[in-house]
A protein has these predicted regions:
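Active-/binding-site microenvironments in catalytic and ligand-binding cores
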Residues: 1-124
C-alpha cells in the first residue's frame, strides 16, 4: 500500500544511459521530437497514484510521460490533482524501497510551471 502524502519514485533503470543522449533520449539530434524513445508512466498508473493521494511522482527518465507522447496525459492527470513531477532523477537504485525522506529544492521562477530542482534523499 502506498500511504497518502508519499513521493513515489519510478526506477526504470534508464538513468544508466546518462549522459549518452542518443541512448537516454532515443536520439542525439536536437529538436528531434519524433525520435524520442524512453519509458514513462501511463495514464492508469497516474490515476492510481492520484487516487492514493501521493504528493509527488519522480522518474529516472527525461519525462513522466513516455518519450513519444503527444498529449502528456500522465503530466495532466497528476498536475490536475496538484501532484508535482520530478524528472531526470539519478541514483534511485541507491534508495531503499521505502522510508527515505525526499527533499526537493526548486529554483524560483516567477510565473513558471516548472523549474530545475535539486533533489536530496535522507536515508532512514
Amino acid at each position: 500500500r502506498i500511504p497518502a502524502g508519499s513521493a513515489v519514485l519510478v526506477r526504470t533503470g534508464w538513468g544508466r544511459y546518462w549522459p549518452d543522449r542518443a541512448r537516454y533520449l532515443g536520439t542525439a539530434k536536437p529538436g528531434d521530437v519524433a525520435g524520442l524513445r524512453f519509458p514513462g508512466i501511463g495514464v492508469e498508473a497516474a490515476k492510481v497514484l492520484a487516487a492514493r493521494g501521493v504528493r509527488a511522482v519522480g522518474i529516472d527518465t527525461a519525462s513522466i510521460d513516455y518519450g513519444r507522447s503527444k498529449d502528456f496525459i500522465a503530466h495532466r492527470t497528476l498536475y490536475a490533482e496538484n501532484i508535482y513531477g520530478l524528472e531526470n532523477l539519478a541514483n534511485l537504485e541507491k534508495l531503499p524501497p521505502r522510508g527515505a525522506t525526499l527533499i526537493a529544492l526548486p529554483m524560483k521562477i516567477a510565473g513558471g510551471s516548472g523549474a530545475p530542482v535539486r533533489v536530496v534523499a535522507l536515508l532512514p
